[in-house]
């Protein structure tokens, strides 16, 4: 029991130190700014990739619903209309303009890469060509992986709903439907924490950090939606511009949840090093 209390104390001690050291609040604000600039270019690239694969036509609407519901709660319809309009306008752009949008989207991926690697205290730098190749793969294959995951989750949910309602007359399928976005979010965060850092990250540590991030993300979404629907005073202040600050605030909260999960994964590796005697807590504090 004493060892458990000691381990918990050491964990929170290291976690709080790393939180301050990595300045996660500032990092979340930086990523919020980068995301705001790259939101339209990123979505334009995503749906352009979908358009190149007719097999994804049936789930494009479901993908939009997933994005707007999870990343713009309570304002999804308004944000969706704006983004659809921006994407349609981008189709009329010249080649130079399209390349500029792609560059902005790649810069966001670079910002995420650099921020997550700083959490793992990895200062190594990849060759520029290698980094560009990875970012380009993420930008092009990422939409396919996400669309496939959403398509599979939708199929499993529909199958479970039909099976349980036919065999048992229960609403278990509906409950599964409500849980699928959470498990999909957990899966995406786990892959993010495993793939992005230059260091090798244990799948257990990645899944643990991703679980906490998914829980905070889901609970934060529900709490945020409840607040802005229960206390709509912001609409009186901002009027027609209310959607913008709401979206910015939610992006900030979302990145905070993602970075907290990443920090947890990194700290678990630190704790393991402490347990194995490979590193001392004084050495952790000396790292910059």
Curated annotation (Swiss-Prot):
Membrane association type:
Multi-pass membrane protein
Key word Plastid present = no
Q: Which UniProt keywords apply?
A: Cell inner membrane, Cell membrane, Membrane, Transmembrane, Transmembrane helix
Q: Where in the cell is it found?
A: Cell inner membrane
User: Is-annotated flag, keyword Cell inner membrane?
Assistant: yes
Under the heading InterPro entries, the entry gives: UPF0761_bac, Virul_fac_BrkB
Q: Which GO terms describe its cellular component?
A: plasma membrane
- Membrane-spanning intervals of the chain: 36-56, 92-112, 127-147, 176-196, 200-220, 240-260
The signal peptide here is none
| Family matches, as PANTHER family | INNER MEMBRANE PROTEIN YHJD, UPF0761 MEMBRANE PROTEIN YIHY
Indicate the family of this protein. Answer: Belongs to the UPF0761 family.
| Entry protein name | UPF0761 membrane protein HS_0693
- Annotated source species: Histophilus somni (strain 129Pt) (Haemophilus somnus)
């Amino acid at each position: 029991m004493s060892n458990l209390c000691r381990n918990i104390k050491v964990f929170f001690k290291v976690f709080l130190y790393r939180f301050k050291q990595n300045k996660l609040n500032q990092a979340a604000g930086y990523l919020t700014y980068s995301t705001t600039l790259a939101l339209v270019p990123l979505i334009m690239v995503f749906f352009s990739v979908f358009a190149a694969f007719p097999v994804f036509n049936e789930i494009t609407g479901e993908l939009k619903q997933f994005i707007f519901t999870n990343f713009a709660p309570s304002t999804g319809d308004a944000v969706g209309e704006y983004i659809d309009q921006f994407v349609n306008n981008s189709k009329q752009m010249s080649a130079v303009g399209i390349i500029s949008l792609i560059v902005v989207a790649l810069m966001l991926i670079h910002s995420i890469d650099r921020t997550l690697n700083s959490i793992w205290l990895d200062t190594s730098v990849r060759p520029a060509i290698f980094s560009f190749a990875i970012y380009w793969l993420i930008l092009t294959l990422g939409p396919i992986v996400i669309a496939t995951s959403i398509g599979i989750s939708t199929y499993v949910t529909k199958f479970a709903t039909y099976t349980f309602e036919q065999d048992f007359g229960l609403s278990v399928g509906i409950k599964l439907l409500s849980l699928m976005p959470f498990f999909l979010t957990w899966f995406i965060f786990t892959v993010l924490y495993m793939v992005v850092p230059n260091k090798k990250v244990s799948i257990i540590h990645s899944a643990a950090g991703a679980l906490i991030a998914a829980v905070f993300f889901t609970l934060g979404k529900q709490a945020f939606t409840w607040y802005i629907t229960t206390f709509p005073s912001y609409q009186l202040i901002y009027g027609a511009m209310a959607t913008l600050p709401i979206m910015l605030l939610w992006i900030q909260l979302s990145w905070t949840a993602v970075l907290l999960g990443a920090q947890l994964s990194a700290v678990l590796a630190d704790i393991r090093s402490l347990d194995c005697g490979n590193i001392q807590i004084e050495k952790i504090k000396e790292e910059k």
